């Protein structure tokens, strides 16, 4: 289905790799949403006569034109997720590695990142003139009877991709889950000198026993108060708020969103291109009973520390992958649902959220990608919500961006079309 109004449109196409996708576009941004895993390989901004894509497109992303088959492709790609991975994607009910939990086969980062979303409909909302696309998914295992409904939205004048993702529990028992958005940026937007920040004011690296044991330069299981004072494994400290080049390490850090925050956020600034990438979501202080509230800023700093496939072209080869995950989640690090249920909390914040029996909750999320003036060159220090704007404060000035930080418009569009 295709729909358009003035200079805003939503169309269905088949992209490279034989993937069915929805493209939402207006004057300032274009968003491509894959059916498979809800991957978002493109969030691009108009730059004069060209476009700049913020999102990561891995060199190893499959273009075989065939679905993943473990017998044929497993030795290189290791998992269906890595066969199709790109950009940003929703991670529910798992955030972390694949595992069997209470008899349920839980794929890496959950069903929402692996299975095919069923496209339902799309169009232009008459009231707001926003473009929207609705997709749904059902749990493949009746032991965990969840259903998912996702509506992707772009609003005229906003350089923001909005998503409302509802999780419904169709069973008679409450279910504790993890949830997250795996925002991943890549070159050419990502480059040395970019500045990372988030709403968290307390950070930690994951404990020993996970995937970063052999890849990280950071001290594991260490807590710190500022990204510019992250502890190194060899001793000393390093500023991880400044993005390096491919240095041969893959690191992870998690920061707790303050319970007093009405708005949660994470940001990446490119001071050379003068582009801001800002994720925002309802904070703990503004939570309602039916909200899925993300509790952590998670940084996956993939700077070349994985000498194995598919990150490297062969086992023991050079990791060719350079990207940054500015992820936001409710989960214990990226260690998975079973681990998150077991530890219950990280930095005093809950690692899971309960979906009540015969009920549901909704995660509302925005990703902004926009030019800015010089005031944000040294990074974003804080983000505040105004009635119709997102205000980012930097060391040398502010940047105000048209947005719907209360998600009032998103809620209205979801109610009319979801």
List each model region and its residues:
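Surface-exposed acidic/polar loop and edge beta-strand patches at domain peripheries
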Residues: 2-162, 173-176, 180-418
